[in-house]
């Protein structure tokens, strides 16, 4: 149970105007600038933002989560009592209007060329973003069409992930020590 840890996340609204049961879905992140700032004073610097977030949420001490300044970007409403959300666009608007933080790159596209242009825009801008991103997810906007398309055992047929080429870095090997046992 990570409830205590999540309650320390400033981007997680502790109350919303909607009166009823709701289940939302999001992704916990650490901004790269926050990681850099944290590492300047940390006894043990964190290797990367993804591991930092996972460790902060799984940690038994909520103060660790709070100190790492984790954020949550929400992207889906899995269930809404007496709600009538018909599209992903309406879903994101509901989340924003309810005080949930959403990813700034959400975009509704019309046609394949518009989709491909949006993917290229994200890939082009990814180095300037303050968050890690390794790709883009394209989803069918209309929920009734999503239901018609269904899913396989593992994945929805109405969503497609585009992964960007991995970023590579070069490092120098300072020394090499070989040991053999005979």
Would you name each region that the model predicts?
Residues 1-182:
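RNA/tRNA-interacting regions in translation and RNA-turnover enzymes
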């Amino acid at each position: 149970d990570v409830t205590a840890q999540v309650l320390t996340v400033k981007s997680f609204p502790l109350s919303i105007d909607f009166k009823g049961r709701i289940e939302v879905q999001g992704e916990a992140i650490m901004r790269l600038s926050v990681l850099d700032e944290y590492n300047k004073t940390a006894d043990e610097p964190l290797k990367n933002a993804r591991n930092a977030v996972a460790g902060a949420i799984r940690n038994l001490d909520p103060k660790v989560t709070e100190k790492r300044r984790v954020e949550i970007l929400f992207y889906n409403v899995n269930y809404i009592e007496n709600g009538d959300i018909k599209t992903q666009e309406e879903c994101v608007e509901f989340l924003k209007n309810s005080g949930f933080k959403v990813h700034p790159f959400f975009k509704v596209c019309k046609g394949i060329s518009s989709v491909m242009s949006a993917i290229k825009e994200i890939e082009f801008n990814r180095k300037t973003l303050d968050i890690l991103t390794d790709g883009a997810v394209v989803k069918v906007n209309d929920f009734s069409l999503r239901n018609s398309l269904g899913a396989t055992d593992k994945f929805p047929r109405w969503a497609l992930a585009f992964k960007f080429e991995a970023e590579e870095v070069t490092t120098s090997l300072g020394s090499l020590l070989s040991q053999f046992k005979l």
